[in-house]
């Protein structure tokens, strides 16, 4: 009897400890990719992206190890009210050695409070650094609506016919919209705070299986006292987005139209940029002035074509028209069909084509890329991960123009100017050539 009594406190302590561990359970999410590759002409794997394009077809065409590690926890809950703490640390290295040191990027640290306002059931208050309602095309790793950064907002306000979200974020800019003192002493600063104010109305059901999302973003350079922008700087801009999502063929199709002005045209995703740093009050990076407009028409999706076939696809036209004639027109189209031999083994073929025309020279850069991959994945969907794949990639390109990146922006007043491929000073264009690579890669998200 005494032995039993002596064991009781220990049992209670162990049970309490187990309950504490359960109560403090941490959510672990993330993403990672890594591998090894070779180039047909020798050396490590090369990756291929058209000069002037903002992304590339990624299957068998990623040359880095990249990871995002997310830790989060619901730290308080009472009824339907709760607080959630979320973090995200990202790493990227060149995958060339065993020991590759890198400084982590602290990409997310935020708290989200749900159902805290009785008058707005279902709404969430949040503050901190956050990936905020990002919209992307997975197969080209292209984010076309992404205002992520430090910020605050109120999201998912139920209006009956849709959900309203309001947010403000910041993206400080090195160079870009840099400023200097208004007196005769030019005190160049490294960063200028760029503010973005975002309004979205989503989940509006407008047809069977179809929803509409509308958004408007305003971005501005927020100057310090007694400072002014460099002459010719793009001070602010707007971006308007309409996206229709249709459920179809066990997947989805998204059709997107976006229009942006001035400071919102450089990145074209909802974050603004201004002008480059002035040097000696006369030398500028040539691409500082982004006054003008952007028009983007995009269609992409992922569908099932039967028991054994899935497919991703994208088609996009983007026109950046700048007052300084340094804009581009970018066409891209690609498909990634997947044939499933078994629920965990598949073959993928990715074919992508890019064409980028220089507004200044009228010349075009084009590239097509073909990748064949054999893959083993955790499930029978094109989205199933983790995946291990072996691949072979062939790319062929013909580039007629590039950018003048000779010397540096302090000494070259035309730094960043679009120039023909035969520009005497040289340019960042790749000429007419082709190459093939092969290797193996893992990819996972959880």
From Swiss-Prot:
Places the protein is found: Cell outer membrane
For the site labelled Important in sugar transport, the residues are 143
The molecular function GO annotations come to: maltodextrin transmembrane transporter activity; maltose transporting porin activity
Among InterPro entries, the record links this protein to: G_neg_Bact_CarbUptk_Porin, Maltoporin, Porin_LamB, Porin_LamB_sf
Q: Which residues cross the membrane?
A: none
Q: Which reaction does it catalyse?
A: beta-maltose(in) = beta-maltose(out)
Q: What does its record list under induction? A: By maltose.
**GO cellular-component terms in the record?**
cell outer membrane; pore complex
What membrane topology is given?
Answer: Multi-pass membrane protein
What Pfam families would the database entry show? LamB (PF02264)
Q: Which GO terms describe its biological process?
A: monoatomic ion transport
Q: Say which domain of life the source belongs to.
A: Bacteria
Keywords in UniProt for this one? Cell outer membrane, Ion transport, Membrane, Porin, Signal, Sugar transport, Transmembrane, Transmembrane beta strand, Transport
Q: Which Gene3D superfamilies match?
A: Porin, LamB type
Signal peptide positions are: 1-25
- Site (Greasy slide, important in sugar transport) at 31, 66, 99, 252, 383, 445
PANTHER family recorded for this chain?
CRYPTIC OUTER MEMBRANE PORIN BGLH-RELATED
Quaternary structure note: Homotrimer formed of three 18-stranded antiparallel beta-barrels, containing three independent channels.
Q: What NCBIfam families does this protein map onto?
A: PRK09360.1 (NF006860)
Tell me its family: Belongs to the porin LamB (TC 1.B.3) family.
Functional summary from the UniProt entry: Involved in the transport of maltose and maltodextrins.
Task: Specify the protein name.
Answer: Maltoporin
């Amino acid at each position: 009897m005494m032995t039993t009594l002596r064991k009781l406190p220990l049992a209670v302590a162990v049970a309490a400890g187990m309950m504490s561990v359960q109560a403090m359970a941490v959510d672990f999410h993330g993403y990672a990719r890594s591998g090894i590759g070779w180039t047909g002409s020798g050396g490590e794997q090369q990756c291929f992206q058209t000069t002037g394009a903002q992304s590339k077809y990624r299957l068998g065409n990623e040359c880095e190890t990249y990871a995002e590690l997310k830790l989060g926890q619901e730290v308080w809950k009472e009824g339907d009210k709760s607080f959630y703490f979320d973090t995200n640390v990202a790493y990227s290295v060149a995958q060339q050695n065993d020991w590759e040191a890198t400084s982590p990027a602290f990409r997310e640290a935020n708290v989200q409070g749900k159902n805290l306002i009785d008058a707005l059931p279902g709404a969430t208050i949040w503050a901190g650094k956050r990936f905020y309602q990002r919209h992307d095309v997975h197969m080209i790793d292209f984010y076309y609506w992404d205002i992520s950064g430090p910020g605050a907002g109120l999201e998912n306000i139920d209006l009956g016919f849709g959900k309203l979200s309001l947010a403000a974020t910041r993206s400080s800019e090195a160079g870009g919209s840099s400023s200097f003192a208004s007196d005769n002493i030019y005190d160049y600063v490294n960063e200028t705070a760029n503010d973005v104010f975002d309004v979205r109305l989503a989940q509006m059901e407008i047809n069977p299986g179809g929803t509409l999302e509308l958004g408007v973003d305003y971005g501005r350079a927020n100057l310090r006292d007694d400072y002014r922008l460099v002459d010719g700087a793009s001070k602010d801009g707007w971006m308007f987005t309409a996206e229709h999502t249709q459920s179809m063929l066990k997947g989805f199709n998204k059709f997107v139209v976006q229009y942006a002005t001035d400071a919102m045209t450089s990145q074209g995703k909802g974050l603004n940029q201004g002008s480059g740093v002035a040097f000696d009050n006369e030398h500028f990076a040539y691409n500082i002035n982004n006054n003008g407009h952007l028009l983007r028409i995009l269609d992409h999706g992922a569908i099932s074509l039967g028991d054994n076939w899935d497919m991703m696809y994208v088609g996009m036209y983007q026109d950046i028209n700048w007052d300084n004639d340094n804009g581009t027109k970018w066409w891209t189209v690609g498909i990634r069909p997947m044939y499933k031999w078994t629920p965990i083994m598949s073959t993928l073929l990715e074919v992508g084509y890019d064409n980028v025309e220089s507004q200044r020279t009228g010349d075009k850069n084009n590239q097509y890329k073909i990748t064949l991959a054999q893959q083993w994945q955790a499930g029978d969907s094109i989205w199933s991960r983790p995946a291990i794949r072996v691949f072979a990639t062939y790319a062929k390109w013909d580039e007629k123009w590039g950018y003048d990146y000779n010397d540096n922006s302090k000494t070259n007043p035309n730094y960043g100017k679009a120039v023909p491929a035969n520009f005497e000073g040289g340019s960042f264009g790749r000429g007419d050539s082709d190459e093939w690579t092969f290797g193996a890669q893992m990819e996972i998200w959880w």
